[in-house]
Amino acid sequence: MKVLVVGGGGREHAIIRKLKESPRRPALYAAPGNGGIASDAVCVPIAATDVAGVVSFAVQEGIDYVVVAPDDPLVLGMVDALAEKGIPAFGPNKAAAILEGSKVFSKNLMKKYGIPTAAYETFADAGEAAAYVRANRKYPLVVKADGLALGKGVLICEDEAAALAAVKSIMEDRQFGASGSRIVIEEFLTGPEVSVLSFTDGKTVVPMVSSMDHKRALDGDRGLNTGGMGTIAPNPYYTPQIAQVCMETIFKPTVAAMNAEGRPFKGCLYFGLMLTPDGPKVIEYNLSLIHI
């Protein structure tokens, strides 16, 4: 059996290490991999976002299964492209990947189906967004780029000047490129933050161990958000009682909502949660095995 893991970071190395322990003893490949992965798998010089290149290699090499670990190739439709060639892959298809690929979509989905999240507004015009900020009197305020931004597209703004600067940076200066064509401006939630990865086949949701993700760049919960500075698990605030509430009010309803929208989600679904005084609320969804 031949298995290809798409990606080139520590997460992909961890996945390959576990696959290496399989009694099936698969031949392992990574695209593009890295120097460390090269000791455990054959690395091929194909970028994780090169959908055509990955598919071509998988066909030529006779790959039996592909694990698409990063979010970018999922949003680009790599799972769909592999399926067209009859190659099964782990991860959501392009239609489902919009759950992370567009924060506007995910926020509207939660609102439509009653999944608890922060109050918000969406904007496609920088002037309208700036006017909304000037009318706001409650800070901090959170400004989010609509599309993928390597975990850096969420800006917590302490005052009007910072919020206006965030709108300008994202929508006018295009700090995150096309991902900033639209933004979400939402209320700032308080409480312990919880990260929960889960496996789903589009019907059943099986959560993994909870974790606490440290996103800020500096000590003392200061600095800009990053893709992640570290994680501890399990999360001490995520009790069995809270886990049950999240399952019934967030996890199951999210999967059901995606089915209702004709976008069944299959793969790994990450729930970024805040345990607010009003109960657990969704901060964000992610597609990938980000805390492996």
Outline where the language-model segments fall.
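Conserved small/polar residues in nucleotide/adenosyl-binding loops
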Residues: 66, 290-292
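Internal nucleotide-binding/catalytic subdomain
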Residues: 154-289
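ATP-binding N-terminal substructure of ATP-dependent carboxylate-amine bond-forming enzymes
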Residues: 1-95
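General beta-strand structural signal in soluble alpha/beta enzymes
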Residues: 5, 30-31, 67-68, 89-92, ...
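A conserved helix-loop-beta module that forms one wall/lid of the active-site cleft
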Residues: 90-153
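Short, charged, surface-exposed secondary-structure boundary motifs
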Residues: 38-41, 55, 98-104, 218-220
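Short acidic-hydrophobic, aromatic-tinged amphipathic segments that line or gate anion-handling sites
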Residues: 44-49, 121-124, 157
